[in-house]
Amino acid sequence: MNETEYFVVDTPGFEDEGGAWATFCEIAQLLDHIREHAVIVAIFFVTPINIFKRRPDPFEEKLYTWLREMSGERFMKYVTFVTTFWEAHNPDQLERYNDFLVRRKEQEWARFIKHGAQTYQFGKVYSAGVETTLHWDTDAEQLAAQAREMIRVYCHEIPIIQPLILHELNMNMGLGSTAAGQVLWPAGDGGTNDQGPSRAQSTASSGGSGRPRSTESPQSGAQASTTPTSPPTTQSTGDDPAAPGGWAWFREFAWEITKRYGPQIVEHVINRQFGSAGAIIGGNGGDFASSMQCMSAKGFDINSVTDTAKFFGKASDMGSRGPNGPIGNGPIIFSIKLQGSYFAQFLNRWQNEDIQAFDPKVDAVNDFMEQKDLFMETTVWNTHCQSWYKSRQTGKITALWPGSTLHYMETLAKPRYDDFDITYASKNRFAYLGNGFSQDELNPQADITYYIRDKDDGLSVFGNLFSTYNAKDIGDKMTALADRAI
C-alpha cells in the first residue's frame, strides 16, 4: 500500500491455559526475529463470535490482560478486536451474537477502546440497511475482499511507537520478566523467568516444567555475548579436584554460579545501573528506538542527519540543523562557548530541581522565527548571494542570529524559562528542596559564609551556583556538619 510492503502474520492461537505459555513463546520468538527488520503497524486480536459466552471465563479474561500488557497503553490505539464466524442461521442467533459483542465492548474491551482500540465484525455486511452475514462456503470472494479492506483501513498509518513487548525485548529482558510474560508464566514453575524468546521457546516446547535443559544453547542477543560457555581451564599445580576445600573445587563452584546468575546480573544490575538499555521516551509517548525502527523500515538512514530531519517532516537543509547563532558575523568559538554555557544552565536546573523535561513552546518558537525573518529582510544577507545558511529554494536565512555577537551573548546570558513547558518528575515541584541543606554546606572545603565581606565589591550575593561537587556520601557529610555545629 502506498509503495510500502506489508506482511500479515497469522500467529498461533490460544487454545487453553495449559498451552498458553508455549503459544506466547512462539509469538515472542517471531517478534524477536523480525523486530530489527520490520515495524508492527497493528495487532488484530481475532476471536470467533460463536464461542463467546454471556460472561467470559477466567482464561479469556487472562488473555485480555495479556494483550494489554503485550501492547502497552500507548499502542492500544493500533489494536483491533476482530470477531469472525458471524454466519447466523436465524435472527435470534444473530441478536445473541450482537449482545455478546456489546457486552465485550462495554466491559472487557472498554479499557482498550478508551485508549483508541477498534472493533471489526468480519463477515458482517449491510444490504439496504439490513444487517446480514457472509458464509465461508458460499461467499469466499467477498470475505477475501473484506479482509483486504480491513488491512487497508487499519494499517494505513505507520506508528512511531511499538508494542510494549518490543521495548522490553530491545532492553534484553527475559521473556518471563516482561509484563506479558508475567501474566502467562506457568503457575508453580520454579524455573527462571529471565529467558529470552528463543530459549523460552525451547523450554516450553520440551514439555517439562519450564526449567531450561542443560543442553540448551546460550541466549541470543546481548545476554548471550556476556554468558560464558565453558569454564576456565587454568589449574594451579597441586590442586586436588576432589578436595571440597581446594581451589579447584572453589573454581568449579564459582563457575556454576557465573553460568547460572551471570545473565541476570548483567540484565538487572549492570544494564539498569548504567542505563545502557534504557528507553528514550518523548513527550508524545513515542520512543527513540521505535522511531529508528520506523526509519529503517521506510528506507531512511538512521545515521544521517538529513534523513532524520526528512523522516520527522522537518527541513533538511544545512541551515535547519542547528540553533541560530552569529557565526556569519562573529567568532565561531565564542558562539559555541555561549551555546554550551546556555545549555549547561538547563542541565544545572534539570538536575537540581528534579525536572523531567523542557519542551519549547510552539508559540515562542514561531514568534522568534517571525522576529528573525523581519530582521533579516533589512540585512545584506537578504541580497542575491548564496551560502550554506541560506535556503536555495526559498531564499530564507535560516541559521544566523538577528543581531551582533554581543547581542547574542546578552540574550543567552539568562534563559527564558517562561518560553518552555516544564514537566517535573515529582507531583510537588518543590520536592527538590529535600532536607533543607545546601550541597555547598556538605562540602568540608566550602566557605559557607562567603557573603560576609569587608566592603561592598559589587558582586552578587547569590554566588556561583555551578559546581562539579556531588554529595553522594551524605551520611559522612551530615556527621561532619554536626561536628561543625551547623
UniProtKB/Swiss-Prot annotation:
Record bears the keyword Flavoprotein: yes
Keywords: FAD, Flavoprotein, Monooxygenase, Oxidoreductase
InterPro entries, per database record: FAD-bind_Monooxygenase_sf, FAD/NAD-bd_sf, P-loop_NTPase
Cofactor remark: Binds 1 FAD per subunit.
Main EC class the enzyme belongs to: oxidoreductase
Biased composition (Low complexity): 220-241
Superkingdom of the organism of origin: Eukaryota
Enzyme nomenclature, EC number: 1.14.13.-
Keyword Flavoprotein: yes
Needed co-factor(s): FAD
Any coiled-coil regions, as ranges: none
Record's compositionally biased regions (Polar residues): 194-206
One of the record's GO molecular function terms: monooxygenase activity
Region of interest called Disordered, as start-end residue ranges on this chain: 186-243
Role this protein plays: Probable FAD-binding monooxygenase; part of the gene cluster that mediates the biosynthesis of luteodienoside A, a glycosylated polyketide consisting of an unusual 1-O-beta-D-glucopyranosyl-myo-inositol (glucinol) ester of 3-hydroxy-2,2,4-trimethylocta-4,6-dienoic acid. The HR-PKS ltbA produces the trimethylated polyketide chain from acetyl-CoA, malonyl-CoA and S-adenosylmethionine (SAM), and the ltbA cAT domain then uses glucinol produced by the glycosyltransferase ltbB as an offloading substrate to release luteodienoside A.
Subunit structure comment from the entry: Homodimer.
Similarity comment text for this entry: Belongs to the FAD-binding monooxygenase family.
Protein name: Probable FAD-binding monooxygenase ltbD
Organism annotation: Aspergillus luteorubrus
Gene: ltbD
